[in-house]
Amino acid sequence: QFDANIIETKSVQWNAGINISHNKSKILDLAGDEMIGDDDYGALKYIKGEKLFTFYLRDYQGVDPETGNAMWMDKNGELTNRVSQARYIKAGSPEPTVTGGFHTDVTWNGITLNVQLEGKFGNKVLIAENNYVQSDGYQMSMNQSASAMNYWKQPGDTNCNPKPVARNSTSSNTSTSTRYMENGSYVRIKDVTLSYSLPKRWLSPVGVNNLKVYASGMNVYTFHDVDYFDPERGVKGMGYGIYPMTKSFVFGLDVTF
């Protein structure tokens, strides 16, 4: 952690600070086992020598450009369209490698701007909800996401979802695969507050000691690449149906007599 007063004059004050932490965990022993499971949809494992939580998932390899079927890597390193033959791989951890924050306050002639940022880096998240809303035809009674419409339509199509088939007998939408895994790193503008304190010489004649007007926003914006409302998915990186962080905006008046 580092804090500094950058400018300190009668009319201008500016300070800023940053904090960074490195997170590291390792499972040393599992009472003789090399790996044991976790209850969360079978997606997480406790693996000796790895971080506390490790995603252990079927190895999804995209869409066959000729047929539109989902492809998987099998134990022999060969591609297959049968999910039952897909190999399982260690696919990263929901634990961030680095977490940090930044804050700064600038005051000029009674006007103050306060900004706070926070971030996490190096973690993976599993958007398990997508097996419902990008179901490739399995969830026929449920609305699908806009991204589900980007599916295979003709030979040669790539970088898309598998072709939708009624009831999806191929199980391409299984939640325990790398298909719905994403980089969970993000930077969030956690708080922005702009305030103005009226000069005391204006207030003294009316018996007011201090008067400040302000506007504040929380969770203003988040920079991330996760195909979901919010990249924060809980300690296990899944948080099935987790409610996203709420944005709030406040305008206020603070008066002291």
Segments and roles (model prediction):
Residues 14-16, 102, 108, 113-115, ...:
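Transmembrane beta-strands of outer-membrane beta-barrel proteins
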Residues 120-212, 217:
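Extracytoplasmic gating/loop element in the C-terminal half of outer-membrane beta-barrel translocons
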Residues 1, 15-17, 101-103, 191-195, ...:
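Membrane-embedded beta-strand positions in outer-membrane beta-barrel channels/transporters
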Residues 5-94, 134, 144, 151-153:
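Conserved small-residue
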Residues 40-67, 144-157, 161, 172-176, ...:
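C-terminal beta-signal and terminal closure region of outer-membrane beta-barrel proteins
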Residues 11-13, 25-31, 65, 70, ...:
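Outer-membrane beta-barrel proteins
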Residues 6-8, 20-26, 108-110, 119-123, ...:
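Transmembrane beta-strands of outer-membrane beta-barrel pores
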